[in-house]
């Protein structure tokens, strides 16, 4: 318990240093754009790929499991849309990104720590936490709404592909179900949740990487701890935010 409280205290103190005003805005902006490409743009491929197949699989599974003469055929599209909007494209996708992006951030900062690059920045009078971590957090929070949007569209395209190429159901029925009682707030709720998840991924992973103490083995452990901790916090935040936004 004491160790956990110490960890939380160190995290809060690190975030206090991180959210200081950047000393050189031009350098910060350059680093910010670089992190957007590394953390956000480079994640588009895996987001589109996973979302496409998940959308297709959800459609097939729902069609097989709720097929009934008493159930309208468009129900498949309706349920697929709700799953993609409310949970998969925001929560589950961020859990996947926690593994990809979180381990990337933790290993990068951990390697800089064990090779004393962070110490060199401190000696030069640079706020290393602000210089290294803040661009990553801002980049993740900025790009995550686009990734969520891409995920939603990729999942819907995957659902339609099951109609066009696999003949699972009529595409007209699927389209009607996707449009039935559509509530645009569900999209905004998913984006709002993803903003919190993006902050958790970037800040928690940066904390474990920045505070590494040891050699290469410690860097590997920090990457694992970053992914596990981020995933647990995302699930907890998902529970709280879903209650607040949808309750």
Residue ranges and their predicted role:
Residues 109-134, 219:
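Short cytoplasmic-facing helical segments at TM-TM junctions of multi-pass membrane proteins
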Residues 40, 44, 48, 88, ...:
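Selective transmembrane-helix segments that form parts of the transport pathway or gating/packing helices
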Residues 23-49:
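Membrane-interface helix starts
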Residues 50-53, 97, 134-163, 196, ...:
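Hydrophobic alpha-helical transmembrane segments that constitute the membrane-spanning cores
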Residues 1-30, 208-209, 213:
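Short, membrane-interfacial amphipathic segments enriched in basic
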Residues 219, 225-242:
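Final/C-terminal transmembrane alpha-helix of multipass membrane proteins
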């Amino acid at each position: 318990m004491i160790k956990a409280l110490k960890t939380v205290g160190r995290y809060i103190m690190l975030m206090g240093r991180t959210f200081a005003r950047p000393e050189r805005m031009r350098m910060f902006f350059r680093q910010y754009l670089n992190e957007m490409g590394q953390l956000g743009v480079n994640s588009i491929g895996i987001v589109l790929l996973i979302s496409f197949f998940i959308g297709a699989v959800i459609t097939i599974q729902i069609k097989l499991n709720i097929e009934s003469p008493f159930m309208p055929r468009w129900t498949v599209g309706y349920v697929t849309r709700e799953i993609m909007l409310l949970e998969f494209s925001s929560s589950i996708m961020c859990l996947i990104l926690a593994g990809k992006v979180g381990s990337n951030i933790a290993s990068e900062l951990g390697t800089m720590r064990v090779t004393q690059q962070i110490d060199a920045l401190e000696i030069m009078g640079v706020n290393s936490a602000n210089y290294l971590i803040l661009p990553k957090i801002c980049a993740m929070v900025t790009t995550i709404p686009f990734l969520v949007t891409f995920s939603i569209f990729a999942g819907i395209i995957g659902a339609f592909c099951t109609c066009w190429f696999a003949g699972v159901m009529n595409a007209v029925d699927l389209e009607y179900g996707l449009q039935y009682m559509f509530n645009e707030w569900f999209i905004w709720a998913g984006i709002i949740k993803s903003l919190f998840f993006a902050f958790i991924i970037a800040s928690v992973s940066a904390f474990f990487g920045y505070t590494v103490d040891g050699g290469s083995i410690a860097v590997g452990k920090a990457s694992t701890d970053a992914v596990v901790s981020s995933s647990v916090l995302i699930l907890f935040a998902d529970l709280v935010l879903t209650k607040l936004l949808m309750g």
